Regions:
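H-loop/switch region of ABC-family ATPase nucleotide-binding domains
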Residues: 218-219
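Catalytic Walker B motif of ABC-type/P-loop ATPase nucleotide-binding domains
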Residues: 183-186
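Conserved ABC ATPase signature
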Residues: 158-162, 166
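Helix-to-loop junction immediately C-terminal to a conserved catalytic motif
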Residues: 64
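A short, surface-exposed alpha-helical micro-motif characterized by mixed small hydrophobic
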Residues: 224-226
Length: 282
């Protein structure tokens, strides 16, 4: 697994670097992402928040290599993964860039497990097929990962036999077994029932404690506050506010837009609490 201790030794150094990133679709009037710049240090958790349609998921997709960029650079440990070219719709990466990209893992909102493979088969496919690692060693590591997320007894199950929360935990194991230096999470609890959200968030908190470098897009503000080291508020494809002190962002944001955004979530939380109280009294 990823060497958390080594990451801590490099704390403060940029693991993932985003510089002046631009993403614009063909025939679009304006960029989806415009002049985005930030660094994610080794062993830190960087959280992206913002309203729907702000470009959060698109940003993660560009970092993961699923969307080409039209400006700026994406780098890992100082080596450029991708340089944007205006008007291009394909990335055209070098062999070295492709190798670096494999060090960035991603967990999606929709699980994306193969329905025709067991839990163990889903986790072991990429490391044996792509990384050419020994099948026996990979299976042993997969079982250890399943134990870590409380699913060792489901290794032979099929995806349709699992709950949404269990499938998402399998997806996290599938990403971890590739030993990513940086792990991206895109609204991984958005498709889950409320009762299943906690089990996934607990796994992510444990990963943060172990020193895994993470970039997280989430609408769970209480969770974001608990896990984030650094945070940005994204809106209309641009950074509205950035804080290297996440707690300060959540308690004392500097921009009016950030204050308004956080107040909305605070209102929603109180409203949900009131609704629950009313139901309990009936």
């Amino acid at each position: 697994m990823t060497d958390a201790a080594g990451k801590q030794d490099q704390a403060g150094q940029a693991s993932l670097g985003i510089a002046h990133l631009v993403k614009q679709y063909a025939n679009a009037d304006r960029p989806v992402l415009n002049d985005i710049s930030f660094d994610v240090p080794h062993g830190k958790v960087f959280v992206i928040v913002g309203p729907s349609g702000s470009g959060k998921s698109t940003l993660l997709r560009t970092i993961a290599g699923l969307e080409p960029i039209q400006g700026g650079t994406i780098s890992l440990n100082g080596e450029v993964i991708e340089t944007g070219k205006p008007g291009t719709e394909s990335a055209g990466r070098s062999k070295r860039s492709s190798e670096l990209r494999t060090r960035v893992g991603m967990v999606f909102q929709s699980y994306d497990l193969f329905p025709n493979k067991t839990v163990l088969g889903n986790i072991t496919l990429a490391p044996t097929l792509v990384q050419k690692r020994d099948k026996g060693e990979v299976e042993q590591e997969a079982i250890r990962l399943l134990e870590r997320v409380g699913l060792a007894d489901r290794k032979d199950s099929w995806p349709h036999e699992l709950s949404g929360g269990q499938r998402q935990r399998v997806a996290i194991c599938r990403a971890l077994i590739l030993h990513p230096e940086v792990l991206l999470f895109d609204e991984v609890t958005a498709a889950l029932d409320p009762e299943m959200v906690r089990e996934v968030l607990d796994v992510m908190l444990e990963l943060a404690d172990s020193g895994q470098t993470m970039l997280i897009v989430t609408h769970e503000m209480q969770f974001a506050r608990a896990i984030a080291d650094q945070v940005i508020l994204l809106e209309d494809g641009g950074i509205v506010e950035r804080s290297d002190d996440a707690e300060r962002f959540f308690t004392n944001p500097t921009t009016e837009r950030a204050k308004q955004f956080l107040h909305t979530f605070e209102f929603d939380r109180h409203r949900k609490s009131a609704d629950q109280s009313e139901r309990s009294e009936q």
